[in-house]
Amino acid sequence: EKILIDHHQEPQKEVFAYGISNTEKSSTCEMVYDFIVESGNSNKLNTTIAQCLYTGVMTDTGSFRFPITSAAVHKMVAHLKELGLQHSIIHDNIYDNFLESRLRFTGFVLLNRMDVLYEYNTAIMSISKRDLQEFNIKTGDTEGLVNYLLTIEGIKFAAIVIDREEERKWSFRSKGNFDVNIFARKHFEGGGHINAAGGRSSDTLNNTTAKFYEVIKEYQQQLQ
């Protein structure tokens, strides 16, 4: 039987025998930690488990800077530290361990593929297969790229579409109360959270990008 532990909006609960979904939690790893503690199994937590739980929480909270990061999250991390967690090593392995080609790719797409739509407080980036091949970029190397767009002053909505072999993959991020989960579900067969979601398209890169430019017009007032 399948058991669901999830923090996304509208999970497919019907395919699980048991489960819980809590969108107020920062991550599934926080929920797993709560389950271990509340079931009276805190004594089974060790350094290896602590590393896994910390990794999930750190990445899902944007290194603890997203609004979903609660006091409970910090208390959890404090407990994991008491178990011997070396958090800086995990951070270095995930965020400070990239190949030179990835950094050059990031600079290239920020310079050549980013479009800032100030009338919608939105930034979008469209990345082709050729771009990926030129820098030998693999799946996962584009993780977090969408967050760069939100560092622009005044930008409330960021979107990246990447031309993968099987389909076009969208990543959406937002600030404030603009719900990218609703946006992704309505327009790009996706979903996720209020401020972070994903989507997909079986259309061409040019066509799905053009669709974004068209539908964003519906949200100008919300994004002011």
Predicted region positions:
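Short, glycine- and charge-enriched coil/turn segments that flank and shape catalytic ligand pockets
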Residues: E1, S39-K44, Q133-I137, E166
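Short coil/turn connectors at secondary-structure junctions
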Residues: E1, V15-A17, L53, Y120-N121, ...
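Short intrinsically disordered, low-complexity coil segments enriched in acidic
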Residues: E1-D6, D34, R200
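Hydrophobic/aromatic beta-strand patches that form the interior of the parallel beta-sheet core
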Residues: I3-I5, Y18-S21, A123-M125, A159-V161
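Short alpha-helices
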Residues: H7-M76
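Hydrophobic helix-and-loop "lid/oligomerization" segment in the mid-to-C-terminal part
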Residues: G62-H187, G192-Q224
